Amino acid sequence: MKTLLTLIAIVLAVASAPAADKAGTNTFCVQLIRGTEENKPPGAGNKPIDDRLDKSLHRVFKTKTFWEVQRRTVVLQDSTKAQVALNGKRAVEIDLSVPGKRRVATFENGKLLSRAIRPAGQAMTVVGGDADEKNVWFIVVRRDVPP
């Protein structure tokens, strides 16, 4: 029974993984997320985040609602890095120069805020900070593209 459950979990994980890019090509979805205590979007064009990300963030943070402020797609070759500007103040750098690792650095007004190093696989990287007492922001780097 335990073996069957393990096999089912593996099949579900593979089935839910995004399709692989061409060899050496890596596509990432970068999202700028804002968390608020309001039920209405904090800005024009902001939309609720997808259910998967919402559940992940609500497991950790008590913020009432999370909004996608901006979304960008980044295509990188292995062993390269790129910096993506978001909303004029924030930026993220995705660095694939170390084989098997994905380094993500966040910047605000050109100043380094944080750096995270993760395996280069399919998992998402979430980094962020406080906007003020009632608002938080996150930059999410993920391989899957939400609806």
Residue ranges and their predicted role:
Residues 1-4:
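Positively charged n-region of N-terminal signal peptides that target proteins for export
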Residues 6-14:
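Bacterial N-terminal signal peptides
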Residues 17:
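Glycine-rich phosphate- or other oxyanion-binding loops that anchor nucleotides, phosphorylated ligands
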Residues 20-147:
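Outer membrane pore-forming secretion/assembly proteins and partners of Gram-negative envelopes
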